[in-house]
């Protein structure tokens, strides 16, 4: 009977690295291992230095890997459900079925359905799940419960779900029930919570722990990753970070009293078979040694774009402008979004800062609560903030759909079916998108800055207009007087036009100057380009600075960064802006101002009185 290990944690804490090291370690012990990534922006292949796709791929003796590709999973799922009906059902019925299975609902359930296949699989001794960042991992793990309940309730009612009749997916309910039982079985399943000794990472881990516990999951262990070597950092300009980490290590021990492994930050990247094996030995067997950088020489990178160029990029010809910040989990998107918003608000522009990430952190950076309704921040008079809250968005979305259906003349029976479909788990995805779309229409602000979820999920959010456009077209064709569908179609067309218009919307990619974030950002840029959306700038975060007293550990990491900054320039061929590594956490306006000033290379948020050039008001 297979055992399972799930890795969960905030983006950028090293989940994939720790999952890979765990899989390799057990494989070297002679166990038959499969590692699976459920992250839409998987980087398993980057770490193994081998192409991995939507099929089980041999990596080394006893170890195979697989990336669950949402598109491939959707096609497989669609064919599994409607394939047997071909040649039996009339062509016009098949056309309707095929359209129904091109919905956003199908995309969500298909990837999740493939994931649950492995929770009822006994072919391997151990299956390691490298999951997406926590907000989306929680969503994935809730789905077996949600879908099982939805199928059960639909069977009692109309017998219909948003992805077809209950009769065609009843067998799935049994599989989902077995998956739920496997996840809750502490003798078979372990959840490793990976975090860094930092405020946002600890807060998100505690939230994940609580939510997983409510799902009936009990078997936890902790990996604290990215700890600086004390003797090295104490002699550097970043000595304050060591004091901060010691403080959080104590807090982690008290808040999460589970078996814990502390892992030192290495001076080189964990990439390639030998580096992974060496790292696994250091972490799990306590072997002496470090994983050093394979980059021995590098040219100093001096081609950062001037901050005024970033200010110019943000200037658009429309009154209401959008700025969308995206990138790999943990590269500093939230801090960058807050810094950009602070600069704009400090320059007298009415600015709205929005987070679409389920694990919202803008409140931690601003050091004040950010709720589900738009509110002015205390820190800056021209800055407002809001987070898209899934539960609130779902409630609002359901009420709106039902009200529109009533106005469109739906019968009582049709409303019953609609209400059942709205209980579908995929309603949450639609509701979040609807709220995102609604915020882009807000004309009260000069700028709307979006702090998005990690790249795979941001791309999914930005694909939704195209998915829903197909569904709306079908709704309009089916019921010509459907006001809701007609209105939705117009809104979708407007949103897609805005996203593609570089005079209206600015896309900025955030990277660390390391291999994996650069590769993921390049894939994101290419995917966006296919949708007609063009990235306009790259922001390199956590860039090290050195001087005569810098110890070897930081010199080696500095050399690695300089090498990858050169690669980033050739890869993106876009202006690269710089945020240096700071010696403390970015929490509150004083440190946020420092970030903004380093990025834009000018004073941020000055205390001003006098003439406002944007509104032509006299401020006293």
What are these regions (language model features)?
Residues 1-13, 18-180, 320, 336, ...:
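Nucleotide-state-sensitive switch-loop elements of NTP-binding domains
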Residues 7, 325-327:
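Hydrophobic anchor at the beta1->P-loop junction of P-loop NTPases
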